[in-house]
């Protein structure tokens, strides 16, 4: 089963990407090198928690 995960920038800009991963085959936290438009360079994005809040 594929679960939605959030990739958070390690540059500390607050920028994030959302993607899916198969938890059965990838049990460790995902890390990817992607472009951060706020920092204007490629940085490592690590898997973070998705908040379940309703906005209030």
UniProtKB/Swiss-Prot annotation:
Domain of life: Bacteria
Transmembrane feature ranges: none
Any one GO CC term of the record: cytosolic large ribosomal subunit
A single MF term (Gene Ontology): structural constituent of ribosome
InterPro entries according to UniProt: Ribosomal_bL33, Ribosomal_bL33_CS, Ribosomal_bL33_sf, Ribosomal_zn-bd
Protein name: Large ribosomal subunit protein bL33C
Gene: rpmG3
Family: Belongs to the bacterial ribosomal protein bL33 family.
Keywords: Ribonucleoprotein, Ribosomal protein
A Pfam family it matches: Ribosomal_L33
GO BP annotations listed: translation
Alphabetical list of HAMAP family matching this protein: Ribosomal_bL33 (MF_00294)
């Amino acid at each position: 089963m594929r679960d939605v995960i959030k990739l958070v920038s390690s540059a500390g800009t607050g920028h994030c990407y959302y993607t899916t991963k198969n938890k059965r085959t990838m049990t460790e936290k995902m890390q990817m090198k992607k472009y951060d438009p706020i920092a204007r360079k490629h940085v490592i994005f690590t898997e973070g928690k998705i908040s379940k809040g309703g906005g209030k």
